[in-house]
């Protein structure tokens, strides 16, 4: 377990706040305070990582602890306690999942099949304004013996924007960095997803701000499948178009990463072991070191003594710095990924492979007796590792998701009790589609949705100078439910008038 060096401890209580198993005891005294690490400690290392004063030290290990292997941290779990994740408990000397397996999933509300697709789309429907007027087209047909109605309108939405997903590891800036169109801020870099960079464009505040017209135009052009050039921090140039690979600073992306560096080791540890003595996988999120990784241990490897040029997180997993280098890191060349070697463990002649998470950048090095490294030609086995990574990567693509909120006055064109259509959408009694495409409706109040623009009818979006974007909105439900919410029954037309 760990202990606290009283001379170094400043009683800041950061370790107390962050310990996931509440193993750090704090008591305020008349003269100072007591901070102690109790026998609940699982050696997860959080206290060491948050202590700015180096006051956390290793102590003698407790008896009857079990090392957990369910994640890279490898908690030392005392009898009767759980590890840092609180999932596994030491019960009588055996680690047991602290919750029974749940077999039955929660029941979900699902719309009936006969209302999942609109009878007609709203593309080209027009808008009846003000919104107290019935929607431009209210159309019915009989499906499976049930009368169904679709209400359509092209709704101006000031609450609208885009979520852009770029399948790339290439550095495009930090979260929150401004995104420009023709010198005007139209969005920002968002929190990234696994294997993809994310950008947010628009939103109500940007649409009503000084750059609202540029923002509306950008949303619509991207949503309609046009190519648009954006800049992050007025430096990094992005050429984006839905359904094709992003172009970043003039370089077209080809494939997206197979996973982070740790995941790549986990997937190919056996192949790496058979090919080389060590493999470093470069990634901006987690750099993998095969021999030290638990996946390397699982195939019979022990730490090679090779030290990667990154900050250690846990066994075989290291954090690299963000930058314009390989895999979105600050490493410009494969050689930069090797910091050095512990020659008390490493042996001259060792072959060290460095590869990125798409398998497109790779090199092989040989360790010399003086601790230096010489690059050598790739062996067939080492090249096989890189090709295996490449073969398991997906094509890089730009995805454009349109987001909007239709919970305002546009509901007046649907019915005379607007809250009823909102409730019906959430109860799956009415299905919202956008240009014929299924939409994800956010939980909670209102009708806030997200839709994949590649599934929407082509060129379906426009904008008005209020400014706001205009989206084709369809609501489909049974005629009985429509009447119950105060629908405009006298405006219903049979589908035969349209087809």
Swiss-Prot record:
Catalyzes the reversible reduction of 6-hydroxynicotinate to 6-oxo-1,4,5,6-tetrahydronicotinate. Pathway: Cofactor degradation; nicotinate degradation; propanoate and pyruvate from 6-hydroxynicotinate: step 1/8. Its cofactor is an oxidized flavin; [2Fe-2S] cluster; [4Fe-4S] cluster. GO terms for biological process: nicotinate catabolic process. It comes from Eubacterium barkeri. It comes from the Bacteria. The gene is Hnr. The lineage of its organism: Bacteria, Bacillati, Bacillota, Clostridia, Eubacteriales. The keyword Hydrolase does not apply. This is 6-hydroxynicotinate reductase. [4Fe-4S] cluster 1 binds at residues 9, 12, 15, 51. It catalyses: 1,4,5,6-tetrahydro-6-oxonicotinate + oxidized 2[4Fe-4S]-[ferredoxin] = 6-hydroxynicotinate + reduced 2[4Fe-4S]-[ferredoxin] + 2 H(+).
């Amino acid at each position: 377990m760990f202990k606290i060096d009283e001379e170094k401890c400043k009683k800041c209580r950061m370790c107390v706040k962050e310990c996931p198993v509440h193993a750090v005891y704090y008591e305020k005294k008349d003269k100072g305070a007591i901070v102690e690490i109790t026998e609940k400690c699982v050696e997860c290392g959080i206290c060491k990582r948050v202590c700015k004063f180096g006051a956390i030290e290793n102590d003698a290990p407790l008896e009857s602890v079990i090392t957990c292997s369910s994640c890279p941290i490898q908690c030392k779990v005392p009898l009767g306690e759980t590890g840092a994740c609180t999932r596994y408990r030491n019960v009588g000397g055996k680690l047991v999942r602290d919750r029974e397996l749940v077999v039955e999933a929660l029941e979900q509300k699902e719309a009936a099949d006969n209302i999942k697709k609109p009878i007609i789309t709203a593309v080209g429907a027009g808008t009846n304004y003000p919104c107290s007027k019935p929607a431009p087209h209210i159309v019915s047909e009989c499906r499976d013996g049930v009368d169904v109605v679709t209400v359509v309108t092209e709704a101006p939405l000031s609450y609208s924007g885009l979520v852009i997903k770029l399948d790339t590891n290439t550095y495009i800036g930090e979260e929150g960095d401004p995104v420009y169109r023709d010198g005007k801020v139209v969005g920002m870099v968002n929190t990234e997803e696994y294997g993809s960079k994310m950008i947010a464009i628009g939103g109500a505040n940007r649409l009503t701000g000084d750059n609202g017209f540029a923002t509306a135009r950008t949303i619509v052009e991207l949503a309609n499948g046009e190519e648009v050039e954006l800049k992050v921090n007025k430096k990094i140039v992005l050429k984006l178009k839905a359904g094709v690979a992003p172009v970043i600073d003039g370089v077209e992306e080809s494939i997206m990463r197979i996973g982070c560096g740790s995941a790549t080791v986990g997937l190919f540890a056996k192949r790496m072991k058979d090919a080389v003595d060590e493999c470093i996988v470069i990634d901006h999120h987690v750099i993998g070191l095969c021999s030290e990784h638990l996946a390397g241990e699982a195939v019979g490897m022990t730490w090679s003594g090779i030290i990667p040029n990154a900050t250690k997180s846990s066994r075989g997993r290291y954090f690299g710095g963000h930058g314009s280098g390989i895999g979105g890191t600050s490493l410009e060349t494969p050689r930069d990924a090797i910091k050095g070697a512990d020659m008390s463990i490493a042996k001259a002649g060792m072959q060290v492979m460095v590869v990125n998470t798409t398998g497109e950048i790779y090199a092989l090095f040989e360790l010399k007796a003086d601790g230096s490294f010489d690059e050598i030609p790739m062996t067939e086995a080492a090249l096989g590792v890189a090709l295996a990574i490449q073969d398991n990567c997906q094509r890089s693509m730009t995805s454009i998701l349109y987001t909007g909120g239709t919970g305002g006055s546009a509901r007046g064109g649907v019915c005379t009790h607007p809250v009823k259509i909102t409730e019906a959408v959430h109860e799956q009694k009415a299905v919202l589609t956008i240009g014929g495409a299924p939409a994800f409706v956010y939980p909670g109040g209102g009708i806030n949705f997200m839709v994949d623009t590649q599934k929407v009818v082509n060129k379906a979006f426009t904008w008005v100078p209020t400014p706001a974007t205009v989206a084709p909105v369809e609501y489909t439900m049974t005629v009985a439910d429509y009447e119950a919410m105060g629908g405009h029954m006298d405006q219903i037309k049979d589908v035969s008038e349209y087809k």
